[in-house]
Amino acid sequence: MKIEASALRQLGIKQIEERAAEIKADLAALRQKKNSGDVGANDIKTAKKNLARALTVRREKILEELVEAYRGTPVSKLPKELRPKLNRSKRRALTKTQLRRKTRRQRARMSKFPRVIFAYNE
């Protein structure tokens, strides 16, 4: 019988882990019964999906607790699983602050030789 994810979300993490252990035991029993031919076509498939659903909801709950625990923490101090998912080049790119920084010599040249804007009117 299908277990709804909404029902699992109302349980605590420990209860979800207990439910997952029950589902694993049921799945093992179903696999044993499969050899004798007493199992319906979709029983094992349903049990596997129920187990996946339970483990997914458990992970969601764990991540929610982590997010609450690390709220207000800078990105560099966050665990990797809570950091934004980026590709490698974006992770290694300079930050906006680092891009804006100028050397003393660059600042001096910018002040001595400001950009000249030529206006053209007909």
Swiss-Prot record:
Query: Which segments does the entry list as coiled coil?
Result: 10-69
What's the chief localization of this chain?
cytoplasm
Q: Record's SUPFAM superfamilies?
A: Ribosomal protein L29 (L29p)
Specify whether Coiled coil is a keyword of the entry: yes
Keywords from the named record: Coiled coil, Cytoplasm, Ribonucleoprotein, Ribosomal protein
Q: Which GO terms describe its biological process?
A: maturation of LSU-rRNA from tricistronic rRNA transcript (SSU-rRNA, 5.8S rRNA, LSU-rRNA); translation
What Gene3D superfamilies does the annotation carry? 1.10.287.310, 6.10.250.3450
Localization recorded for this chain is: Cytoplasm
In the UniProt record, which is one GO cellular component term?
Answer: cytosolic large ribosomal subunit
Annotated InterPro entries: Ribosomal_uL29, Ribosomal_uL29_euk, Ribosomal_uL29_sf
The UniProt subunit note reads as follows: Component of the large ribosomal subunit.
Q: What is this protein called?
A: Large ribosomal subunit protein uL29A
The gene for this chain is: RPL35A
